[in-house]
Amino acid sequence: VFKENLEARQLMRAVVVECKLPSLPSRAEEARAMAENIGYDVVDVMVQRRKSDHHSYFIGPGKVEELKEVVDANEVETVIFTNTLPSSQVFKLQQRLGGDVRVIDRNLLILEVFDKRAMTKEAKLQIKLAKLKYTLSWGREFIKLRGIMGEQVGWMGPGDYPFQEYYRAARSRISRLEAQLRDLDRKKEIARGRRRELGFPAVALAGYTQSGKTTFFNRVASESKRVGLGPFTTLSTFARKVRFGASQSSECILIDSIGFIEDMHPTIVKAFTATLGEIAHSDLILLFVDASEETPVIARRCLSMNKILREIDADGQVIVCANKIDLVDSEQVASVLEAIRERFVGTAVIPISALTGENLGELFAAITRNISNVKVTAGLPSTFVQARNPVRPE
C-alpha cells in the first residue's frame, strides 16, 4: 500500500508547511533543505504560528484553504509538514487538498532521505522496517479514504475486513525484516568479537548529520567516501584500520556511522539500533559538533546528543570535536567551546578542521592517550592505513 517510487518523484513540486508552536524550534528551513536535496522542487514554505495544533488539520482551517490555493495554482504533488502528524490528520488533509496530493510529515521525509542514501542491505532493511512500523496505524485511514471499509472480495481476500488483512500482512513483513536484521546484528557481533581478539580498540565517529564526520574519516583513512551531498550521506557503518601515532598502541578500528538528527521519532531510532550499536560498543566516541552553527543551535544539539548516547547505552570515553573552525573567527570558536563544555562537563573538547587539518595533531594525541590502555594482542597487518600527520609520542 505504501510502496514508494522515489525515482519517479524527481523534481516533484512540493510545499513545506509548519505549524510553529511556542515550545518547538522551527524546522521549516531544515525540511526545505532535505526536500530539495532529494529532488523536490519546493515552490513555497508556509508557516502558521499557533498556541496549539488544530484537532483536524494541525494547522487552522483558514490556513488549509490558503494551502489548497497554493497547491492548485502550482500543481503541487506533495505537501511536507515539519510537524509529526497523526494518521487521521494526514488523511483529512489529503481529502481537503485532493486525493492525488500526498501529505507527509517530517518523519516520512527523513525516511525518504534515508531511502535515497541507502547503499547497503542493512540500511535498506532498516528503512523498510521503520517505514512499516511508522505507517502501520495508517492502514485504517488509508482504507477509509477510499471507502472500502466493508467486506469485499478481491485482492484483500473474501469475507475479511481490508484493514485486518493489511494489518496481518504488515505484521508478518515486520517480523521477517526484524529476523533479517537480527541475523545481520549477530554477524556484526562476531566481527566485533574478532576485533577484540586481535586487540584493536574501536573508535566511533558520532554527531549530527553534516558535522564533518565523513570528511574526517576520509582524511584519516585515506578514503574517498561521498561527502557534502546533504543530510545522511552516511547511513551504514564503515570501518577501517588506522594508526593515529607512531606506536602500535595507537592502532584502532575507525568507524563512521549514521548522523543524528534532532527529535527523530523513536520508531526510526529503534529501527537503526544495529547501526547505532557500533557507537554503543566502541571504546572511544569522537562526537562531532559543527562549530559554524549558531551557538543556541549547538547548545540544543549537545543536549540532544547526550540524550541519544544515554538511550543507546554508549559507555565508551568521549572526545568532543568542535569541527569546521576554518569557517569561523576565534571569538565564535571561544563561544562554541564554552557552550559545549557547559553541556559536556569533564569531557575533552578539541577544536579542529577536518577539511584543512588544523589542530588534528592535538586530537590524534588525545585519541592515542585514550586507546593506549587497550591491550594489543596482535599487530596490524602490513597493509594498514596510517592516519595522515600522525602524532609521534614524545
PLM features per residue range, with description:
Residues 1-16, 32, 133-211, 217-218, ...:
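C-terminal-of-GTPase-core extension/linker across diverse P-loop GTPases
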Residues 1-112:
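N-terminal accessory targeting/assembly segments
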Residues 2, 198, 220-252, 264-274, ...:
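Switch I (effector-binding) loop of TRAFAC-class P-loop GTPase G-domains
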Residues 20-22, 53-56, 117, 121, ...:
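Flexible beta-alpha connector loops of hexameric P-loop NTPases
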Residues 28-36, 68-73, 80, 84-98, ...:
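Conserved C-terminal guanine-recognition region of P-loop GTPase G domains, centered on the G4
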Residues 112-117, 236, 360-362:
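Short, charged, surface-exposed secondary-structure boundary motifs
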Residues 107-127:
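Short alpha-helix plus adjacent loop in nuclease-associated cores
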Residues 20-23, 50-52, 84-87, 108-112, ...:
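Conserved nucleotide-binding/hydrolysis micro-motifs of P-loop NTPases
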